């Protein structure tokens, strides 16, 4: 039996079809034949090694996406990235609104906004710690 004839019977890329016990079809295949042997000279070398991981890689045939599909995918990815960046920019703007202004009229960069937020949070934390210490002193002395 030639390789072309063999391919007609066995579906591509399914190593489970190499073993007679795993075939669920009523179709007669060379694998179901009583005369079939893995040592047969007509049996392809790529399948006679037991169907390891290398066989799966060889069997996979990826169809190259069409230029139209690639353009559509790129366009969709660009749109998702635009939305993500827009959301991030809105979040930066909202953060700038709650930070105290240092230079009126100058918009802080993203990096400056994050630095300013960090310093502002540290100052607020120190104020809270100082207030709690003052409360403790008042309660002990009072």
From Swiss-Prot:
InterPro entries from the UniProt entry: bHLH_dom (IPR011598), bHLH_transcription_factors (IPR050359), HLH_DNA-bd_sf (IPR036638)
Polar residues: bias regions: 30-48
Region of interest (Disordered), residue spans: 30-66
Endpoints of the signal sequence: none
Residue ranges annotated for the bHLH domain, each copy included: 72-124
Disulfide-bonded cysteines: none
Record flagged with keyword DNA-binding: yes
Record note on disruption phenotype: Knockout results in ectopic AMsh glial cells and also ectopic amphid socket (AMso) cells, another type of glia, from a different cell lineage. Some animals are missing dorsal, but not ventral, CEPsh glial cells. Mean number of ectopic AMsh glial cells increases on cnd-1 or ngn-1 mutant backgrounds.
Compartments it resides in: Nucleus
Keyword annotations: Developmental protein, Differentiation, DNA-binding, Neurogenesis, Nucleus
A GO cellular component annotation in the UniProt record: nucleus
Major location (coarse): nucleus
SUPFAM superfamilies noted in UniProt: HLH, helix-loop-helix DNA-binding domain
Organ and tissue specificity: Expressed in PVD motor neurons.
Keyword Nucleus attached: yes
UniProt-reported outcome of changing residue 81 to K: In u282; 99% loss of the male-specific genital sensilla (simple sense organs) known as rays, and tail touch insensitivity
GO molecular function: DNA-binding transcription factor activity, RNA polymerase II-specific; E-box binding; protein heterodimerization activity; protein homodimerization activity; sequence-specific DNA binding
BP GO terms, sorted: axon development; embryo development ending in birth or egg hatching; glial cell differentiation involved in amphid sensory organ development; glial cell fate specification; localization; negative regulation of gliogenesis; nematode male tail tip morphogenesis; neuron development
Cited PROSITE patterns: BHLH
UniProt-listed Gene3D superfamilies: Helix-loop-helix DNA-binding domain
Record's subunit section: Forms a heterodimer with hlh-2.
Function: Probable transcription factor which binds the E box motif 5'-CA[TC][AG]TG-3'. Essential for the specification of the neuroblast cell fate in the development of peripheral sense organs. Its role in the generation of sensory neurons may be through positively regulating the expression of the zinc finger protein ztf-11 during postdeirid neurogenesis. Required for specification of cell fate, acting in concert with lin-32, in the development of the male-specific genital sensilla (simple sense organs) known as rays.
Protein name listed in UniProt: Protein lin-32
Annotated organism of origin: Caenorhabditis elegans
């Amino acid at each position: 039996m030639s390789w072309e004839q063999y391919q007609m019977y066995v579906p591509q890329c399914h190593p489970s079809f190499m073993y007679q016990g795993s075939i669920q079809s009523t179709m007669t295949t060379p694998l179901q034949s009583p005369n079939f042997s893995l040592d047969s000279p007509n049996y392809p070398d790529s399948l006679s090694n037991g169907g390891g991981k290398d066989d799966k890689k060889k069997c996979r045939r990826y169809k190259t996406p069409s230029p139209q599909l690639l353009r559509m995918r790129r366009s969709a990815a660009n749109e998702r990235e635009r939305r993500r960046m827009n959301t991030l920019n809105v979040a930066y703007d909202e953060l700038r609104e709650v930070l105290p202004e240092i230079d009126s009229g100058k918009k802080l960069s993203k990096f400056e906004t994050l630095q300013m937020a960090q310093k502002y949070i540290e100052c607020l934390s120190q104020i809270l710690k100082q207030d709690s210490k003052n409360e403790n002193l008042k309660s002990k002395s009072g």
